[in-house]
Amino acid sequence: MSRYLVFDWGGTFMKYALMDEKANIVEKGKVVSPGKKDTEESFFAVIDTIVEKYPGIDGIAISSPGIIDSTEGIIDVVGVFPYLQKLPLTQLFEKRYGVRTSIENDGKAAALAEVWKGNLSDVKDGAVFLIGTSIGGGIVLDGKLRRGKDFFAGEYSSMCVNIAQPSSASSYVAQLGTSGLIEKVMGYMELDEKIDGEQAFAFINAGEPNALKALKKYTDDLAITIFSINVLLDVEKTVIGGGISQQPILLKYLKQSIQDIRTYHPDFLGGINLPLPEVDTCRFYNDANLIGALYHFLYEYHK
């Protein structure tokens, strides 16, 4: 049985797992991620301590934030680790550890997990929206992940929704990250003290009227973005992931917001009955990036 060491690099923690070719996790763990002020040398020192635990592995697969040239194995635009920008990472790993290595963007890795074994495995065309610090994900067309010529496909956060205020964070889809929902709850409830996502959903799930109004405004904005992507690509299914997607009430409200688009605009484009996107949650949550990174490795080296 082949064994692979798979990494999910994040800003807070660096997760890793020993996995087989069917994505079964044999063992996993995590360490605190190196900081932005660390160096390439100190970064690799952390990786060394993990790789040393697993002699005889058949490859290394990596999921990482940033705009990633997955063909050349280079992080073109760094998401977390500035000292890794433009380095030939897969070459460095292969030379250092003696095994084949692949790297993929974290949002695209999560999309690949859904294509391989998740809630997009039964469709040819789909979209994944990951709600985290901002909005990332991936686009799947004809069963294949669409990366784009600059590897920028699926970076929804950069979509501008208010050109009149280009320097404002509220002008971009990035506002629909978890912090955007929290800010809406705080605003609608007129809270002075900062709350976190868990507290926001405590108010929402308790049925607090203003918190529910905030959630509806949030899902209305998210629905418009999902609808716009669907008008462009006409996908069979859109799935949402990220921590807050595990809250059932989010999907319930999002589905209603999508229906409301047609209700509020019955004469849109002369009454054309535009198809509404089918939405669901991702199957995988915490392990999605690991599973997708492994799939990318297997596809690259065993296609």
Predicted regions and their residues:
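A cytosolic small-molecule/anion-sensing beta-strand core signal
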Residues: 20, 64, 141-142
